[in-house]
Amino acid sequence: MKKIVLALTFVLVGSFMLAGCSKDEILNHYNNIVQSAGSIELTGKSSLQGEKEKGIDDYTGTYTADYANFSGTEYLFGGTSIKREAGKDLSIDCTLEITEGTAKVFWISGSDEAVTLIEVTGTYSDTITLPDGGNYIGIECENFTGNIELNIE
């Protein structure tokens, strides 16, 4: 019974808060909530193997790292924005050097399979267009020794 009363209270409070808001204001509030939730998926700065400089939002910035026998996945950039203020296009420049093990830089969108951007020593440069919803760029490593320089604008 308490759960029902609590749920109804939230619905009523939410209704009063949104009363008088335009459709665009409601969508902007919703987008902000969704974006905040999407930031949780990113690997925390203290858990990253390298140094990350944030750009204008969670989708952009630079990341450089030297790895030594690292196994794991780092979600570096991205989020769950419905309407990204800076537009849907991201310019990606990446230099990957693999000394040992394997590493692949990937882009995952929604529930789609991850798209490998680069997985061999070399460079990658392209512009991708993000669909609405969750989009993340990361690196997946297995006993990886090497380095990465990643710049996203």
Question: Which residues fall in each region the model found?
Answer:
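A glycine-anchored, Pro-Gly-centered beta-turn/N-cap motif
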Residues: 61, 131-135
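Extracellular and analogous surface-interaction loops
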Residues: 69-90, 127-132
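Short, surface-exposed beta-strand/strand-loop-strand elements in extracellular ectodomains
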Residues: 100-116, 152-153
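C-terminal motif of bacterial Sec signal peptides marking the signal peptidase cleavage site
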Residues: 17-20
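Edge beta-strands of jelly-roll/beta-sandwich modules across compartments, strongly enriched
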Residues: 140-153
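Transition segment at domain starts
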Residues: 24-81, 115
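A short beta-strand element within beta-rich, extracytoplasmic domains
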Residues: 88-98, 139
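Positively charged n-region of N-terminal signal peptides that target proteins for export
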Residues: 1-5
